[in-house]
Every structure is written in structure tokens, then in C-alpha cells.
Amino acid sequence: MADNEFDIDAFFASHGEVSSPENQHCGFIAIVGRPNVGKSTLLNKILGQKISITSRKPQTTRHRIMGVDTDGDYQAIYVDTPGLHIEEKRAINRLMNRAANSSLSDVNLVFFLVDGTHWTKDDEMVLTKLQKSNFPVVLCVNKVDNVQDRNEVMLHMAEMSKKMDFVDVVPISAKQGKNIDVLRKHVRNHLPKATHHFPEEYVTDRSQRFMASEIVREKLMRFTGDELPYSVTVEIERFDYNPETDGFHINALILVERNGQKKMVIGKGGEKIKTIGREARLDMEELFGRKVYLETWVKVKSGWADDERALRSLGYIDDL
């Protein structure tokens, strides 16, 4: 073979079979449920990597995040939504509900996540919205690994299955990955023939800048008390790649509403903010695959969570 001749067999051997547009399937799957039921954990497990932050605290997810899973001819675009909840006392809560509701449009399948042990008023609210829609819904009964009595889970599932004509009722553990393969089969069955929306290597529609802000916010929730999650946000003021250091230089501004919260974030002798910064930097380096130089500041901005102008500048309105 001449040096400049293209070896098509070698190309396919190294790159795998290229999906042709006429054989492609593509569609959207909304992951919905009340706050803190495991939606982001499920998305991360399906994708095999972390794109949506998690914590034990409710309403960790504030934005609508898309995760892209491409397998040959099939591309599934998952939409992780903020938890739908009844209380809408603050502007940020109203916007989170609106972002979650707007995700329930033009989807091909819905995963409705509920807890494997109990049913709440917020679950009932989500169910009511789904009953009014025409979308096929798979009821995903999560956290079954936390229940010792198998009969208890089966009885709970039987009761919930009567609430709506579900495509299927699947017991899962988002954390352990139990029955993820069953969910994938349902996804394939509901993806229409359509050209892929994203290149094969894409995993999310969100930018690295956005992911950096979310990682810092996750560490804030992990290392601070229960009061902070609803009163803190993160704005990335600088996100630059420096070829000399072959790394990202990132400045993160942490906004809180009161001086007491600022002291809580900084900690005694600045120890807490150092821990938050260190842990965030390590996660960013793993995600971005490069060295990260992260600097963090804390600033008091009273009432930001009730100010729609401030929320718009911080990117919350863009989800609608």
C-alpha cells in the first residue's frame, strides 16, 4: 500500500463502526421526582461518570442538566431536573419548579423516581402532573437496597403501580446501579428514528465553566451546615486555560446572604474554605483532565435568591 493511501479497514478497527444517519435513533428522557430522591445519582450512574452534583440535602440540583448517552445508532438525551416541590416561597424555588416543569415537554419517555419506602405530598404533586400528560412513564422505585424486607418493597410497588398506567414499575438502586440495564431497554424501545443531536463524544450540554461552579457548590453543601444550601450560590468570574502551565486558572465567587453565613463558609482560621477549595480542585482536575489553579472568595449579597435580576445574571433564568 502506498504511504498516502487511506486504509479504511485500519480506520474502522481503531474507531469502531460509524453510525449512519439513516439508522440513527435519538430522543429525550426526563428524570423527574421530588427533591432528594436520587435523580442526579441515577443520571451519573447511567452515563458512567459524574456530570450532576449530589448531596444528601434536598434541592441540590438547581438547573436543568442534559446528559448524553450514545451507543452506536442510539443516542439517549437524559434531562436531570430540579426536584418538584410544593413550597414556592422564594424566587429561586419558583424558578426551580418552572425549570423542572419545562423539562416535561417534547420528551419520549419519563423516569418517575420515588423512594422505595414511603410516598409524600411532593410525590403526589409530580404524579398529578404526569397524569395530565400523554408521556409514557416508567416508575422507578429507588433505594430498594435500603430496605431489608423484600415483601415490604413488593407491597409498596404494588400500591404505587395502581396510581397510573405505567409502562413498567422497576425497583432500582441508583447508587448501586441495580436494574439500570432494564431502564436502558425501555429507553431503546422509546427512541424514535432521528439524527443524533450531539457528537458521539459529548456527555453533557453544560460547559466546563458551569461544571466548575457546580463542583464548588457541591463541596459547600458537603462541608457546611443545613442552613446554607438555600442561601449560597457560586459565580465563576474567571475560567482560563494557560498553555504555559497547561492548566485551568479558575476564580470562584461564593455568594451568601448574611455575614454569619460568610463566617460559616470561611471557618475558623480559614480552614473550611481551604477544605472546600482543595476538594473542589481535586474533582475539577479529575473531570477536566488537567491541572487546576483555583481561587475562592466569599461575598455577602443580601436577598440574591429573591432577586430575579440577580438570578438571571447567575444563569437561573436561562433554564426556562
UniProtKB/Swiss-Prot annotation:
Region of interest called G2, as start-end residue ranges on this chain: 59-63
Every Era-type G domain range: 25-193
PROSITE patterns reported for this sequence: G_ERA (PS51713), KH_TYPE_2 (PS50823)
Segments of this protein annotated with the region G5: 172-174
Organism superkingdom: Bacteria
Main location per the UniProt record: cytoplasm
Region described as G1: spans on this chain: 33-40
GO CC term, one of those recorded: cytosol
Topology of this chain in the membrane: Peripheral membrane protein
UniProt GO BP: ribosomal small subunit assembly
The UniProt record lists the keyword GTP-binding: yes
Binding site for GTP: 33-40, 80-84, 142-145
Region described as G3: 80-83
GO function terms (MF aspect): GTP binding; GTPase activity; ribosomal small subunit binding; small ribosomal subunit rRNA binding
Record keyword Nucleotide-binding present: yes
Pfam annotation, one family: KH_2
Region (G4) residue spans: 142-145
Location in or out of the cell: Cytoplasm; Cell inner membrane
Reported function: An essential GTPase that binds both GDP and GTP, with rapid nucleotide exchange. Plays a role in 16S rRNA processing and 30S ribosomal subunit biogenesis and possibly also in cell cycle regulation and energy metabolism.
Family: Belongs to the TRAFAC class TrmE-Era-EngA-EngB-Septin-like GTPase superfamily. Era GTPase family.
Protein name in the entry: GTPase Era
Source species of the chain: Vibrio parahaemolyticus serotype O3:K6 (strain RIMD 2210633)
Gene: era
